[in-house]
């Protein structure tokens, strides 16, 4: 049979060039001169199959396996040998029909690589495949002159190895070794498990005590938590109720303040005006009295002078002289005419003054009506703004209550790394607000945090408190900074309707810019929908485009548009609240100003009416005096015409008399005017005095009311602060101490408490004291004891399994020993049956037998050989000659081969010590065995070469480099002859 199909070597020892030997016969001889490298085939085969002893490979180090170099050939960097076996009969422990084994070593590394059919493997895998085929170290598969001598000289225990390989019990030996090692490991594991088990028992006992204590602690702690949270929630709700009451009271008082403070200011302003006007009127009275005194003095002087003139005129009239009477009448007419002209001038002046006052009254009345209208409109606007503010506050409070992000922000003391919702950090250009809000969508309410760790803690808080879901924007961990591609931006900048990128129209802190870029960096702003469609098309519909009106063209081409109710957004809610408050402040200021203007106009209107009334009275008096003077003039003219029978010619009177009358008329008019003004001024003072008294009373009442309200407000605010502090402390305790939100605590711990507040506090103190007295608590022991018990059960199960495994392994060892003993003994018996035939053939007679050195222990017994060549009876093989020793060894070895055929046997000059006749017998035995065994024979002997099916020659045509080639018997004999001559 042919088992080894192919031998390939490169760089191994003297095989500098790659050589390949294909084996086609079952008996192949390798011949060549000494030093030609023919035995390197044996070394190569040993090396591939895992030989590690450099001595057995005839080398000192791994680098000696690699071609060292010669004069004509450089040293090789590596050595590799590959053996290909026919495994069609499944002789190897591998199902593949052909097995190729290769070993490679690199110069300087000292490490080998092993391959099976081109796949990198371990030496152990190769050893496993080639077990029990006789090619292992010390086995029968490789027989050299040295191994023949070794067989004879070896100790019985060492000699046993050949018989074990032949019997095939090596697999049992290895199996037993594995099982024994496994048993040893199992026993060791059992000891270790026993130690662990004992430790676990101690730990369990200790943990049981700790866990019992911990469970009592946890139960008491939970009861304390239940009671304390119930008390805290009750106090919170009670305090919240009181806080609401105080807030309502404060709101009511502040509302009254808003109403009464402007009224007080108005009253104080009016009082100041009244006082000032009263002082002005008082000063005016003094001035008028002084002026009136001077006028009276002037009138007295003028009347005295007129009286003198009148006496003179009357004296003339009383005279009988008609001429003098006529002259007197002329003078009287002239005087009265002068007085009439003066009175008529006064009438015209007064009429003009009345006209001016009437016009001014009309103007003031119009201004007053306008002011009233503005005041009404302002009041209506103020009411609307106040209602709008209440609505916005309600919206804000609703958002605060329902938004999980705000709940997190409220609990910043319990959580770190939270900042605020995104809307609080952004500012938009007004014209882009609608577009940007549309682009941001719900992300405007996302919660900004420092990093992922803060987000994870917040999410855990949300889960624990069952609050809801929040989307987080971690500043440090936003990894993407989206932008529009430069080539697309270049296109956009050339198109009409392109208003920029969303992120360009947002103001924010620099640290938040990556977030803004991530959300708006790829959002295009367009002027209108038509432009948006165009921009989307020119950028291949890769980006979202938003118009100033909020229409959207999404990436991919989806369009969204139409009427949308202008709802409040999270972004502008706070802005609108601030705007509403500013509007209310402005409207309140406007209302105060309008009321002040209204009071001033009403006062002015009253003054104008009084002046008008005064002027009308004065006009009436002037008209009466004009009528009286006209009648007097008419009477004088009639009398004059009766005396003269001619009409009055109107010749003017003397300058002095006329001027005197005019001065007197003016003085009387001034007196009357001053008297009227003085009377009006007195009436004004009386009116102002009443107004001042009334205003002072109202001011005092209102000031007293405000003082009372201030006191109430101080008390209410103190109460508010007190309950706010209580609520704050309770919230901090629940947030920080229990890691719960107030909402969750109210939902789960708002339970009736059967104890009074004092009793509950005392019970809490007692429970806390009990907890403190319990000392250190191992809370982990509760979970640990379950784990520890499980581990104990597992280890105990493992302990029992190991005990069972030990029994099973011991049983397996017994079974292995039994099988090995049986098969080994069968081999010994078969060899002893075959040995006499082989021995007689080689020796031509005599006897030979193998025996156990210890028949009671077949598996450990050595093997002794007893041989008696013809005519000799020896007790020790060492007494035989060298040739006899060789024949004895070969007799036993060939007998073994007949009984247990090996697939491959390598004979390395094993017959060198035999004479020609025995060489021939040696060769015949090999030839008879070649049907079941492939022989690779390295030989110098002609008798052996003649029996070989094929001869291969090994020669060094180039110094240091071995070449192999087929060779004839004649050529082989020439090699031998040359070798002998040398």
UniProtKB/Swiss-Prot annotation:
Q: Which UniProt keywords apply?
A: ATP-binding, Coiled coil, Cytoplasm, DNA-binding, Nucleotide-binding
Q: Which SMART domains match?
A: SMC_hinge (SM00968)
Highest taxon of the lineage: Bacteria
Q: Which residues form a coiled coil?
A: 171-235, 263-377, 568-627, 669-713, 753-818
A Gene Ontology biological process term: sister chromatid cohesion
Q: Taking every annotated instance into account, which residue ranges of this chain make up the domain SMC hinge?
A: 416-535
What protein name is recorded for this chain?
A: Chromosome partition protein Smc
Q: What is the lineage of its organism?
A: Bacteria, Bacillati, Mycoplasmatota, Mycoplasmoidales, Mycoplasmoidaceae
